Amino acid sequence: MQLEISPRQRSQQQKEEEGEHQQRAGEEAVGAVFSIEPWVDAAAVLVPPLNFAEVNDGIFRSGFPAADNFAFLLSLKLRSIVYLCPEPYPEENTRFLEQNGIKLHQFGIDGSKELLVNIPEEKIREALKVILDVRNQPVLIHCKRGKHRTGCVVGCLRKLQKWCLTSVFDEYQHFAAAKARSTDQRFMELFDTSSLMHLTASQC
């Protein structure tokens, strides 16, 4: 024998089912909010990395980007990052690049403070080839603080742009400040640009 459900009971049952559905939807919505990466927030404040600056159209420099800089990096519409440290890229930063289609080019240069350390000229040269390839732009160049390794790469780029050494050194010292190294400036002075002169003026 099948019991009939009265209209009142049916109405109460529907209300309970609707309540459970709304509760599940609310829980899913809350879960979705917490799963969103912080850089996706449209209301996020744009905070540039330490020592950030525009070098040229489509070329930028900075210190190491932290998570609170990611929204700012998105605003640059980067295609590539040139990373000048030998240490592995942090997992959080790697995930950010992967999820936003940004390619990482790593040229590990030792950040030793020893005055007699040799700066690897070939790595600087290869980094410049990547930076000046318009297919990789917009591109961000960075090391740890955006001072020495980044400063050397940008200084060598300026030589390609025919800057005089005084201007090259002034820019380097602006970012390095009290930490400026004579060895860095000597390296930039002696850097041979002849093998890179085939790069077009528009790339520089």
UniProtKB/Swiss-Prot annotation:
Question: Which BP terms from GO are recorded?
Answer: defense response; regulation of defense response to fungus
Tell me which residues this entry annotates as catalytic.
C143
Q: Where is the composition biased (Basic and acidic residues)?
A: 13-27
The record's section on InterPro entries has: PFA-DSPs, Prot-tyrosine_phosphatase-like, Siw14-like, Tyr_Pase_AS, TYR_PHOSPHATASE_DUAL_dom
Sorted alphabetically, the Gene Ontology cellular component annotations on this record are: cytoplasm; nucleus
Q: In which tissues is it expressed?
A: Expressed in roots and young panicles.
Q: Per the UniProt record, which EC number(s) apply here?
A: 3.6.1.52
Q: What does this protein do?
A: Cleaves the beta-phosphate at the 5-position of soluble inositol pyrophosphates. Has highest activity on 5-diphosphoinositol 1,2,3,4,6-pentakisphosphate (5-InsP(7)). Acts as a negative regulator of defense responses against the fungal pathogen Magnaporthe oryzae.
* Remaining remarks: Plants overexpressing DSP2 exhibit increased sensitivity to infection by the fungal pathogen Magnaporthe oryzae.
Put simply, this protein is called Inositol diphosphatase DSP2
